[in-house]
Amino acid sequence: GPAFQDSIEIGTPGKGGAIKVYGDFGLPEEFEKRIRDAVRLRKMTVDLMEGS
């Protein structure tokens, strides 16, 4: 994929895990989708680890 230079870090390593989302601040709609997808996958991972 493309080499994104912008990133946002969400969460903390001790509270469900930190994720870093890369994207392009010049394309906010695309970046928002990447963030939403990453948060959804992070929640799924936490749920799996907790046995939910």
Enumerate the predicted regions with their spans.
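Compositionally biased, non-globular sequence tracts
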Residues: 1-52
